[in-house]
Amino acid sequence: MINFKDSQTKENLMRAFAGESQARNRYNFAASVAKKQNLAIIQDLFNYTANQEQAHAKQFMDKLKDFSGEEICISASYPAEVENNTLTLLRLAQEHESAEHDEIYKSFAETAKNEGFNDIAILFENIASIEKTHSERFKRYGDML
């Protein structure tokens, strides 16, 4: 097992925390757009999902408690979405949630397993399955719009 301090898993947890935190804000912004377009149900969907993303971010941060007060340097890219169209925002959210499920968190889980952090691998796998649900829900609501 690799020392957690020197692991890729530590950095992946921070990437996941950053990604979930940004998703939360993007969904809060999207909820405001939906509100302006009088789409209350879509507004609620974005707010509900934003709260779930916050819960995911907390779970990832909790795994980093041993590094409290330290900085963890990561390199990653995140989407910049400045849109005023609710359908476009739903489609973008669907794509991002799908990528988290299909690629990102599966890869992070595999790395965690390879490094010997099975509990963290399970966390990534569990959250990946939730992200799949998010993607499917965003698609369903987008299709209805």
Language-model features and meaning:
Residues 1-145:
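Non-heme di-metal
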